[in-house]
Curated annotation (Swiss-Prot):
It comes from the Eukaryota. PANTHER family: HOOK PROTEINS, PROTEIN HOOK. SUPFAM superfamilies: Hook domain (SSF116907). Involved in endocytic trafficking by stabilizing organelles of the endocytic pathway. Probably acts as a cytoskeletal linker protein required to tether endosome vesicles to the cytoskeleton. Involved in modulation of endocytosis at stages required for down-regulation of membrane proteins that control synapse size. Not involved in synaptic vesicle recycling. Required in R7 cells for boss endocytosis into multivesicular bodies (MVBs). Has a role in regulating adult longevity. One of its GO terms (biological process) is determination of adult lifespan. The keyword Lipoprotein does not apply. The gene is hook. Belongs to the hook family. This is Protein hook. Homodimer. Interacts with microtubules via its N-terminus. One of its GO terms (molecular function) is microtubule binding. Its main location: cytoplasm. Residues 5-123 form the Calponin-homology (CH) domain. The coiled coil domain mediates homodimerization.
Length: 679
């Protein structure tokens, strides 16, 4: 294990302790990102959800480094979002973002070390951080030191938005570092004491074995001494006999006894030495046990301190939450004070509105009095309408009779002119025919002195045709029979023409007699008198209509003023109602936010009832105002229609003495602006 990659291997050993489904034993297995995603899901399932985990492609990754890179990108983005959104940490630019491409292609250990460092920060700051910290504490000391260094590096490169530290708070960091140092020292002392205890136990076992051996030798010597004291014969037949001074046996026993005494002295010295050593070792064991008890107490204190640190962390978090709640409550208090002031203002405004409503009611009563006057005017207007309709019908009849008489007079005049022209023409034709007959009787057919220009067109045609026939007869040298027939035909035609001339003369005479007997001048005088009378009547009616129109215009001005005041009052009432509702809703919200127990149901019911009463009053007022507006609009429309009808009839009466084309050339009467506005 190199010094550069020591932190990576320590983080990998910690990562191996996690219970994951995906393989996570080496860098190649971690480079696909599946195990890292499962670990994040295990740390914070509320942030790294199962739907997010399903986006990580676990199957068909293999050696495809692009798929591995996409998985690692998702993991890195999720970790950064967790740091910024959930933990409220921002990583400083000196902490480089892990290179996903290098991990996916080359399994770069330094980049993978950064990624594992970020995952470690997530584990230390998640909801189950106590269990993961305990697992880290159960690792070896070297691994713990590397992991602690990784956490310190991550903490130095993070910056929290709210005051209070990085990944681990300053207070907990100092306490953890002190606890780790004390724990390492205690473990070293525990190992040294255990080694000493093991050595002393070995020495104790050796001394016990030596003691047992010495006891066995003593027993053997005592048995030999008892055997020698007996007066028995030995196996070689020599009588051992009693022990006497100077005997061989006595000397041997004396020598053996001295040897045994020396050995006893040596064994007693050794025993005393061993006793002293045993006492020293027992004292050492007692001291070591006391030391172990002290270390156990320190470990218990350390665990209690860890618990206190966790409690302090939770209390700091709760304190932050409480501070935030305090700020919100302060803001709500300020809003409540503002709302109190606003409610006072609204109460004053509501009092003003009540006074204004009373004034509006008085105005409505006044308008009710004016309503009776308007109805009287309406009845008068209706009577005038009926009179005007009758007069207009009479005028129409007179106009029609006048037009018929004028048309008859014009027709008679035209017929008279045409008859006079025909009479003159017939006289001329008659004179010419007389002259023609005289010329034929004398035998000079060609010597006609009558000018053809004075003859009528039909006679000229006939004469030309007869002359052509005469020429044809002369040129063709026909028989006398043909000439006789032609002469007979010509005579018949002349007789027919004479009969026509006689009938025309008779008709002229009858027409002249009729024209003289009818006397059209008298009729024209009578018609002119009737037209003058009708014009005088029309002028009287126009004067009456103008007077009624002036009265109607004055009434319309009053009605428009009243309608404008009513519309302004209605708009003000609507604005006041909207403001009142908003204020009531704000007051309800304020009462609910202050204390829901104060805002009882009775007060809410009272407020709702008052609101309903005000709404009903406003609806009734609005309905009465709408009815008044409808009646005024209806009267205005009737007056405008009546005025238009009168103006059109007056225009017709004024143009009755003119021709049809002259009346068409005249401009139509313009409609008033009030009618255009009302439409």
């Amino acid at each position: 294990m190199s010094a550069q990659n020591g932190m990576y291997y320590s983080l990998l050993e910690w990562f191996k302790t996690l219970n994951l489904n995906a393989p996570h034993a080496n860098a190649e297995e971690l480079s696909d990102g599946v195990a890292l995603a499962q670990a994040l899901n295990q740390f914070a399932p509320e942030s790294f959800t199962n739907s997010w985990l399903s986006k990580i492609k676990s199957s068909a990754v293999g050696s495809n480094w692009r798929l591995r890179m996409s998985n690692l990108k998702k993991v890195v983005e999720g970790v950064y979002e967790y740091y910024s959104d959930v933990l409220n940490y921002t990583l400083q630019p000196d902490f480089a973002k892990p290179d996903v491409q290098a991990i996916a292609e080359k399994c770069d250990l330094t980049e993978l070390e950064r990624l594992l460092q970020l995952v470690l920060g997530c584990a230390v700051n998640c909801a189950k951080k106590q269990s993961y910290i305990c697992e880290i504490m159960c690792l070896e000391e070297e691994l713990q030191a590397n992991i602690m260094r990784a956490l310190q590096d991550l903490e130095s490169s993070t910056r929290q938005s709210v005051e209070g530290g990085g990944v681990v708070s300053s207070m907990s960091r100092n306490s953890l570092s002190n606890m780790l140092e004390g724990n390492t020292k205690a473990q070293e002392e525990r190992d040294a004491m255990a080694q000493k205890c093991f050595e002393t136990e070995k020495k104790m076992l050796l001394l016990i074995d030596e003691k047992n051996n010495l006891q066995q030798e003593l027993q053997k010597i005592q048995q030999e001494f008892a055997r020698l004291e007996l007066n028995t014969i030995g196996d070689d037949g020599v009588s051992l006999g009693p022990i006497q001074a100077g005997s061989v046996r006595y000397n041997e026993l004396r020598r053996q006894l001295e040897l045994v005494k020396e050995e006893l002295l040596q064994s007693e010295g050794a025993r005393e030495d061993l006793k002293i050593k045993a006492q020293q070792q027992e004292a050492d064991i007692l001291h070591m046990q006391q030391r172990i008890d002290e270390l156990m107490k320190t470990t218990a204190e350390l665990t209690s301190l860890k618990d206190e640190v966790d409690v302090l962390r939770e209390s700091t978090e709760k304190l932050k939450v409480c501070e935030a709640q305090l700020e919100t409550y302060k803001k709500k208090l300020e809003e409540y004070n503002d709302l109190k002031k606003h409610v006072k203002m609204l109460e004053e405004r509501s009092a003003d509105y009540v006074q204004q409503n009373a004034q509006f009611e008085e105005d409505a009563k006044r308008y009710a009095n004016t309503k009776g006057q308007i109805e009287l005017f309406k009845k008068e207007i209706q009577d005038l309408h009926t009179k005007l309709d009758n007069e207009s019908s009479k005028n129409v009849k007179l106009e029609f009779d006048n037009k018929n008489l004028e048309s008859k007079a014009l027709a008679l005049q035209r017929e008279k002119d045409s008859l006079l022209k025909e009479r003159d023409n017939l006289r001329e034709a008659f004179d010419e025919l007389k002259c023609g007959q005289l010329s034929t009787n004398s035998g000079s057919l060609t010597g006609n002195t009558v000018s053809r220009e004075l003859q009528p067109a039909a006679m000229v045609d006939k004469i030309q045709r007869l002359e052509a026939e005469n020429k044809a007869l002369r040129e063709g040298q026909g028989g006398q029979t043909a000439l006789a027939q032609l002469l007979d035909d010509a005579n018949k035609r002349c007789e027919h023409l004479r009969e026509q001339i006689k009938a025309a003369n008779e008709r002229i005479l009858s027409l002249t007699h009729a024209s003289q007997s009818d006397d059209p001048i008298l009729k024209e005088n009578e018609l002119s008198k009737q037209i003058k009378q009708l014009m005088e009547l029309n002028e009287q009616k126009t004067l009456q209509i103008e007077e009624s129109s002036t009265q109607n215009s004055a009434m319309q001005c009053k009605i428009t003023q009243l309608e404008s005041t009513l519309s302004t009052r209605e708009q003000e009432l609507m604005a006041y109602e909207v403001k009142y509702r908003k204020c009531v809703e704000k007051a309800k919200e304020v009462i609910k936010t202050i204390d829901p127990r104060i805002a009882s149901g009775l007060e809410a019911n009272i407020l709702e009832k008052s609101i309903d009463v005000i709404e009903e009053e406003s609806k009734t007022k609005m309905s009465t105002m709408e009815e008044q507006l409808m009646t005024s609009a209806y009267y205005r429309l009737g007056v405008n229609a009546h005025r238009d009808a009168v103006e059109s009839k007056l225009a017709l009466l004024m143009g009755s003495g003119q021709t049809f084309l002259a009346r068409q050339r005249q401009s139509a009467p313009r409609k008033s602006l009030t009618t255009m506005k009302s439409k």
